Amino acid sequence: MKRIFFSLLFRQRRMCLWHILISILFFSSITFSQKQTQKADLVLLNGKIITLDSHNTQGRAIAVKGNRINYVGTNVGVMDYIQQGKTQVIDLQGKPVIPGFNDAHLHFLSGGLSLLRVNLTGCKTKTEIATKLKAKIKNTPKGSWVVGRGWDHTLFNKGQWPDKKFLDQITSFHPVYLTRIDGHVAWVNSLALLEANIDKNTPDPEGGEIVRDALGNPTGILKENAADLVANLIPSPTDGDMQKAIQTAIAEAKKNGITSIQDNSDLNVLPIYNTLAEQGNLTVRVSEWLPFEWIKTPEKVDSLKSAFKERGNLLKLGPFKGYVDGTLGSRTAYLFEPYTDDSTSVGIPQYKQEELDSLITKADKMGYQICFHAIGDKANSMVLTAYQKALETNGRQDARHRIEHAQVLREEDIPLFGKLGVIASMQPTHCTSDKRWAEERLGSERCKEAYAWRSLLVKRAHLAFGTDWPVEPLNPLMGLYAAVTRKDPAGNPSQPSWYWRESISLIEALRAYTIGAAYAEFQDNLKGSLEVVKLADMVVLTKDIFVLPPKEILNTEVEATIFDGQVIYVRPEE
């Protein structure tokens, strides 16, 4: 049975609570009848309201009228907004209330599908992987694709790439396609290679690599654009599959206190979001990104924008997203100097500087917001250079261009974020997941400027945090913990934290997950802080993480999620 946090629990206490309220009102100079127009639909009192306004003000109570906040302040002050029998009054019993989390970077459709497909996240042995694949194959007709994601060779294969032979032993009747945890490498079996006509004579595609053995034969590992040679053969999810995945993802977002997402999914999700919005079932605000390659074909953009029905503050089109490089885990992130553990490689760039400069300048002139995936220091430098050239050519405007991930930076490039107004859109748990092997890939010197949250803030950069789900868990609280401690959930390293000088405070991290993320999508005037007239999206936490040791963040849950002024999630009873 669910915890009746917002219904029976408070109905049972209502008489006692109202005795208290009436006593307070007796000493108040303002009666209920004097301000009828201000009466609230929902009041939360006796709590700790973390507003995240410009002064980081705290309150004890908050009132909501419709889908907007109409009061933040004291328990006494909120009495003017209560109408007995009509206003829902909730005693928070000291629990903190924060703005709803805004996930600035995730893949909502992929996340939902990952919960419905083979999920290899966290598998530490080949036996675990085989067990999950066999369970899926048992219910999959011969000849049909087996698709999954989440494997990480640094967990189960001594850091070495797995190969097709292992998958061939599990099935020779199903083509298998499994993406790595970062989504930038595919592991396939021989049948999948055969279906794609990939053999020793197949050249590497531009921006990709077919990993080969000593004889030149494909091993079953396909990096970056090479993965598309197989991925393009896999039947697309049906409308029903996508709808189920999005509904599953929305349920996950609710329980994690996420009320806004900045989504990098297939644009086929737009009709699904529209339908859910019409039904009143879209309980997360969506900014849907567009492919940067569309900049080359403006007619595609015009066609989509003319057909797309924006739904106010609920559903809108977001920036144009592109990729400059890959990831550290797969050694495809683009670096100035070779990888410490592979002197033959600097990663795989997706653009030459001149092409990137031209495209970004063109997009900026058209007034489009741009965000580019860049992880390696060379990739980040390339994007910053292109943004600077666009500014010099087109003049300064409120573009709010972004770099997604911004994981490895040169010291001289960090000030450019603030100088150019470029948003660093980062995911804190990447730091604590990657630290297991980051020094092996980069060496200690480059790690000093990796995941450099503190340095970026010092140089007046705007931070926007997200989860990158399903690459990392859809849990912003884990991100808060990572940003504050730079430790993994097990508490490692114990002392000191991993390059601890780049850690930030809890309030700074929370701002990046809320008002900072809202700024990154031009909606900081609507949401991201708990202020009068802003949208009533908020989260009640089970513990006061602002006074407890940081490790308690991981033991904290979302007690309730309020979206658009409505309670949409209540934590189940234990």
Q: Positions of the model-derived regions?
A:
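Short beta-strand segments in beta-sandwich/barrel cores
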Residues: K48-I50, N67-I69, Y519, M538-V539, ...
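His/Asp/Glu-enriched, well-ordered alpha-helical/loop segment
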Residues: K244, T361-C371, I375-H401, H405-A406, ...
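Flexible, active-site-proximal loop/turn residues at the rims of small-molecule/cofactor binding pockets
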Residues: D152, L267, H430, I545, ...
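Glycine- and charge-enriched low-complexity intrinsically disordered segments
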Residues: V570-E574
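Non-cysteine beta-strand/loop elements that form the S-adenosyl-L-methionine
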Residues: L314-T332, G421-T432
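Structural alpha-helical segments in enzyme catalytic/regulatory domains
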Residues: F308-E310, G418-G421
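Divalent metal-binding segments
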Residues: T37-L45, I50, S54-S303, G318, ...
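Bacterial Sec-dependent N-terminal signal peptides
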Residues: M1-T37
